[in-house]
């Protein structure tokens, strides 16, 4: 999910 604090940072 894309939130204000990035949830995707762990997914390089």
UniProtKB/Swiss-Prot annotation:
Signal peptide: none annotated. Its main location: secreted. One of its GO terms (biological process) is venom-mediated platelet aggregation. The complex may be glycosylated. Residues 11-12 form the C-type lectin domain. It comes from Trimeresurus albolabris (White-lipped pit viper). Trimer of 3 heterodimers of alpha and beta subunits; disulfide-linked. It is found in: Secreted. May not activate platelet via the integrin alpha-2/beta-1, since antibodies against this integrin have no effect. Potent platelet activator that aggregates platelets via both GPIb (GP1BA/GP1BB) and GPVI (GP6). Alboluxin induces a tyrosine phosphorylation profile in platelets that resembles those produced by collagen and convulxin, involving the time dependent tyrosine phosphorylation of Fc receptor gamma chain (FCGR1A), phospholipase Cgamma2 (PLCG2), LAT and p72SYK. Keywords: Disulfide bond, Hemostasis impairing toxin, Platelet aggregation activating toxin, Secreted, Toxin. Expressed by the venom gland. This is Snaclec alboluxin subunit beta. Belongs to the snaclec family. GO terms for cellular component: extracellular region; other organism cell membrane. GO terms for molecular function: toxin activity. It comes from the Eukaryota.
